[in-house]
Amino acid sequence: AKEKGGKLTAGLAAGGHWNPNKAPHHGFPWSDDAHLGDLPALTVLHDGTSTNPVLAPRLKKLDEIKGRSLMIHEGGDNHSDHPAPL
């Protein structure tokens, strides 16, 4: 957890999107002008499980993400800097 607005908030300690190339905004994982850490949608079943592979076409080596967190958000993702329900 990390503090925000005087309250401990779970997940904030993971940090922001991985953006080593200083891309200007969030976007689709296959877009060269998006954060390198932007990933595609993950489909999860009602019981909370998923067996779908997560494809990250711009990540080439596991060492690139070693020591990093993977954050999965509930709900849809419009691949925007201003998230909105789908």
From Swiss-Prot:
Question: Which one Pfam family would you cite for this protein?
Answer: Sod_Cu
Give its E.C. classification number: 1.15.1.1
UniProt subcellular location: Periplasm
UniProt superkingdom: Bacteria
Specify which residues bind Cu cation according to the UniProt entry for this protein.
17, 73
Keyword Zinc listed? The answer is yes
Tell me the protein's name.
Superoxide dismutase [Cu-Zn]
The species is Mannheimia haemolytica (Pasteurella haemolytica)
The root-end lineage is: Bacteria, Pseudomonadati, Pseudomonadota, Gammaproteobacteria, Pasteurellales
Q: What's the encoding gene here? A: sodC
